[in-house]
């Protein structure tokens, strides 16, 4: 249900912006004209250490100052830690490195391995345990010095209330499709702000840049390039930041090739 609601909601915001000749970011408050973005998808779980050691510096050369990798599939804790060590040694101490576990660990694993990677000063550890284990997440967040992020698997807005009330996270991550669209995104962002907790985005950077740039507690935008080919033009990446489109609405135009590819006759 929330996926369909999100599509309608995003379309309505786009229409409103075009009718008023303003960008969606401007309609939402227009806090900034660009925000930091982190490279995602290039250091994923199937890739071996040699590939990661080679790819991570290339992301820095592309201008990214933040990047995310993954843990959660290795047979031993030592091999999990090796993934983080490899990326950190490849990029040095001045680049922000995050890590996504995709809900694959339990609480004890999260604390054990989380403590072992603290020396690598991760920017955050993401989605360590199943999303509804608010008390478990709170235990992890309390035990680790590394910030704990979660929220991408949450549908709707009510679960975020439980997450915040249990002090389960240090950073709230919002998936625009699962939460219910732009309108619901900003309800969650407001809740997080009341707890003095920053917000980051999950996927769809072309649209999420409007959301993160418009809120005072917006921290960074995930730059996953999966949806770039759907549009004629996408927001520019400059020096590790994503630029907010200044065109009316979302500032996006679907590619004719994409329309032909996905058209249902």
What are these regions (language model features)?
Residues 20, 77-78, 101-104, 123-128, ...:
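Short acidic/polar alpha-helix capping motifs at helix-coil junctions
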Residues 26-29, 49, 74-87, 106-109, ...:
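Active-site-adjacent beta->alpha loops and helix N-cap segments on the catalytic face
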Residues 1-97, 102-104, 108-111, 115-119, ...:
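N-terminal capping/lid subdomain adjacent to the active-site entrance of alpha/beta enzymes
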Residues 115, 121, 132-241:
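Shared catalytic-loop signature of beta/alpha-barrel
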Residues 65-73, 120-126, 168, 172-176:
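Active-site groove signature of glycoside hydrolases
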Residues 38-40, 68-70, 98-102, 126-128, ...:
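A cross-family glycoside hydrolase active-site/sugar-binding cleft signature
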């Amino acid at each position: 249900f929330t996926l369909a609601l999100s599509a309608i909601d995003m379309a309505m915001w786009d229409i409103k912006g075009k009718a008023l000749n303003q960008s969606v970011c401007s309609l939402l408050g227009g806090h900034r004209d660009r925000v930091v973005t982190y490279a995602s998808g290039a250091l994923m779980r199937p890739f071996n250490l040699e590939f990661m050691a080679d790819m991570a510096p290339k992301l820095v050369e592309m201008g990214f100052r933040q990047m995310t990798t993954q843990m959660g599939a290795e047979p031993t804790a030592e091999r999990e830690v090796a993934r983080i060590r490899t990326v950190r040694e490849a990029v040095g101490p001045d680049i922000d490195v995050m890590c996504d576990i995709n809900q694959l660990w339990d609480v004890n694993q999260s604390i054990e391995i989380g403590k072992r990677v603290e020396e690598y000063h991760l920017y955050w550890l993401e989605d360590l345990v199943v999303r509804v284990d608010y008390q478990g997440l709170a235990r992890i967040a309390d035990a680790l010095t590394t910030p704990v992020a979660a929220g991408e698997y949450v549908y709707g807005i009510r679960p975020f209330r439980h997450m915040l009330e249990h002090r389960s996270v240090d950073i709230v991550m919002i998936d625009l499709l699962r939460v219910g669209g732009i309108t619901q995104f900003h309800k969650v962002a407001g809740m997080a702000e009341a707890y003095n907790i920053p917000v980051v985005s999950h996927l769809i950077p072309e649209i999420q840049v409007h959301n993160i740039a418009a809120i005072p507690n917006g921290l960074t935008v995930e730059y996953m390039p999966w949806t770039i080919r759907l549009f004629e033009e996408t927001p520019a990446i400059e020096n590790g930041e994503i630029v907010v489109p200044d065109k009316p609405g979302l500032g996006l135009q679907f590619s004719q090739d994409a329309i032909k590819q996905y058209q249902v006759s």
